[in-house]
Amino acid sequence: MALLTEKRVKKTHAPASDSSPEESDSEGSQNSASEAEGNAGWADSIQKVLKTTKPKTQKKTVLARAKKSQAAVRFQKDAANKKPGFDFEIEKADVKEEDEGDNHEDEKPQASALDATLTKQQRKNVPLQLRVKPSFRDMERERTLRKVATRGVVQFFNAVRIQQKDLQQQLEEAGPLDSRQDAVLNNINKRKFLDVLMSGKRAKSTPVDNAVKKEEQETDDDDEDKGSSGKKKSEWSVLREDFMTNKKIKHWDEEDDDEEGHNDEADDSDYDDGEE
């Protein structure tokens, strides 16, 4: 029985082995045929893509647009937002503090840029802010200041000229010896120059802001204010309240009578002379 079973198994395996090379030959021939023919669908699709014309309104070509597909964009966003992994854990409070610190660092350059622009604007506006519109009330003060300035400059140059003349004269008197000339130069004193400067004809202290004149102006202003509160000074004398009580016009009618009497007497005398 064992021998019969072995013979049957050999018979079954034998045709299988015979059929395998035939099948392999058929598969190889099909593969070679497919390689020779190629993929017709792929060739057609590539041909259509190559034949497509580029639209005038669109700058990018078909193949270049494929780079910006949704999948590629998502992948790039994920890669950008992806944080590096760490072996340790970070507490939430620390993360918030770091985020706040990053925000402050981001805000600092903006503030510095604003400060720079503000400083530039302020520098441009500084000359405009220093300009002051002159007032007619300050004209006299400006004139006095100009006079004082001119006098001071003239006095200063006169003092320098006098000092130079004195020094030249002393050097001539000292002679050609260097030791004597050095002694003369060492005797130059700052105090002497100031004495010469303050002893000139124009060396007079002129008060620019006169306190007495200011007080007089203030009193005049107060009087004007009082007069404006009541009645004006340049008012007709008849309209004043003390017109009738004034001593000068108290006996105005008597004076007129006396004048009329004198006039009548003069007329009578003239008339008598005419009759004679």
From Swiss-Prot:
GO terms for biological process, alphabetical: maturation of 5.8S rRNA; maturation of LSU-rRNA
Disordered: region residues: 1-132, 201-276
Keywords: Phosphoprotein
Stored InterPro entries: Rrp15 (IPR012459)
Coiled coil: none
Any one cellular-component term (Gene Ontology): preribosome, large subunit precursor
List of residues that carry Phosphoserine: 269
Highest taxon of the lineage: Eukaryota
Biased composition (Basic and acidic residues): 75-95, 226-245
PTM annotation (Phosphotyrosine): residues: 271
Acidic residues bias locations: 254-276
Similarity remark: Belongs to the RRP15 family.
PANTHER family reported for this sequence: RRP15-LIKE PROTEIN (PTHR13245:SF14)
Record's protein name: RRP15-like protein
